[in-house]
UniProtKB/Swiss-Prot annotation:
GO terms for molecular function: DNA-binding transcription activator activity, RNA polymerase II-specific; DNA-binding transcription factor activity; histone deacetylase binding; protein dimerization activity; RNA polymerase II cis-regulatory region sequence-specific DNA binding. Keywords: Activator, DNA-binding, Nucleus, Transcription, Transcription regulation. PROSITE patterns: MADS_BOX_1, MADS_BOX_2. Highest expression found in embryonic heart and skeletal muscle. Low levels found in adult spleen, lung and testis while no expression is found in adult heart, brain or skeletal muscle. One of its GO terms (biological process) is positive regulation of transcription by RNA polymerase II. Signal peptide: none annotated. Its main location: nucleus. PANTHER family: MADS BOX PROTEIN, MYOCYTE-SPECIFIC ENHANCER FACTOR 2B. This is Myocyte-specific enhancer factor 2B. It comes from Mus musculus (Mouse). Belongs to the MEF2 family. The gene is Mef2b. It is found in: Nucleus. Heterodimer. Interacts with HDAC9. Interacts with HDAC7.
């Protein structure tokens, strides 16, 4: 329960007046003690009651404080009951209101209202919530996200190299997919011969391209088995495509299987013969400048090479266009005129 409000006027009852004097006198001395300790000041209280009895309080020594008082001659603050009443009226508090702690400087009713509202608003108003902002995604991440490529050959995976305008698939389980091209494409497209030096021998490859050379040997045996239409051979779709920079492809990674017709409709490559289709079996990174020209991956071009008179007898007549040379690997290959027809524009990039 709060303190009972009383009217600030002379108490007529003698007993009540005596009790109130005793309590408030001690309260006044207690406040003087707190002020002297907290603010390091000298305080002297001199009180005479209605019966003219003296009550005094001094923070240190009354005589010393009174001596300082009599010797002090500078202007100082001096208050009376009239000054206190005027200050209370200016603050909007009557004499019958609750006790008010006197603060430094006068405070009007508007200032007190703002201070009260500010204290209530600071304790009751909730703090503004700050929500974390998601990091902005780049345009490439918004369009699609490509999972990281797994290094090494995947014997059961089938697929083809995506073009620039195609969207890569999110996930392709191993063993499922589509063949590289249908049998109808084999009859209409001719693979370009492997890159050979002018003297008819294979060029010396850098140490980083040894794995790709082994992959090309695998493609030789692959195409030699597909010379005749009736002879079965390893399926072209059994060779999975490697990510750039991987050299783990070897002849033992190829799986055996027949060619399957493609369930997809013919792409734009079958309609437009002037657009090359770049499909690689083992792909290496871009060659460094100043090094010898690397061996290009085996690819299928839509451009038909003109028949060469010197090499027409090396292939059977049953198949219209040769896929690869049928001679064994130990026998040196003869340079043909088709090597001079390869231009840098036809190399896959």
């Amino acid at each position: 329960m709060g303190r009972k409000k009383i009217q600030i006027s002379r108490i007529l009852d003698q007993r009540n007046r005596q009790v109130t004097f005793t309590k408030r006198k001690f309260g006044l001395m207690k406040k003087a003690y707190e002020l002297s300790v907290l603010c390091d000041c000298d305080i002297a209280l001199i009180i005479f009651n209605s019966a003219q009895r003296l009550f005094q309080y001094a923070s240190s020594d009354m005589d010393r404080v009174l001596l300082k008082y009599t010797e002090y001659s500078e202007p100082h603050e001096s208050r009376t009951n009239a000054d206190i009443l005027q200050t209370l009226k200016r603050r909007g508090v009557g004499l019958d209101g609750p006790e008010l702690d006197m603060e430094e400087g006068p405070e009007g009713p508007g200032e007190k209202l703002l201070r009260t509202l500010g204290g209530d608003r600071g304790s009751a108003s909730p703090r503004p919530r700050i929500y974390p902002v998601a990091p902005a995604m780049s345009v490439s991440e918004l369009s699609y996200r490509v999972p990281p490529a797994t290094p090494g050959c995947d014997p059961g995976g089938l697929g083809e190299v995506p073009s620039v305008h195609s969207r890569p698939a999110y996930f392709r389980p191993p063993g499922l997919g589509h063949p590289i091209f249908s049998p109808s494409h084999l009859a209409s497209k001719t693979p370009p011969p492997l890159y050979l030096a002018t003297d008819g021998r294979r060029p010396d490859l850098p140490p980083g391209l040894v794995g790709a050379r082994g992959g090309l040997g695998t493609s030789r045996s692959l195409y030699s088995g597909l010379q005749s239409p009736g002879a079965p051979g390893p399926a072209l779709g059994s060779f999975a495509f490697l990510p750039s920079g991987s050299t783990d492809c070897s002849p033992g990674d190829a799986a055996q299987g027949p060619l399957q017709p493609s369930p997809w409709p013919p792409t734009r490559d079958a309609v437009d013969p002037a657009r090359p289709v770049a499909r690689s079996l083992c792909k290496e990174g871009p060659p460094s400048r100043g090094a010898s020209p690397p061996t290009p991956p085996v690819s299928i071009k839509s451009e038909r090479l003109s028949p060469v008179t010197g090499t027409s007898g090396d292939f059977p007549r049953s198949f219209p266009y040769p896929l690869l040379l049928a001679r064994p690997l130990a026998e040196p290959l003869r340079p043909s005129a088709s090597l001079h027809r390869l231009t840098p524009d036809s190399w896959p990039r």
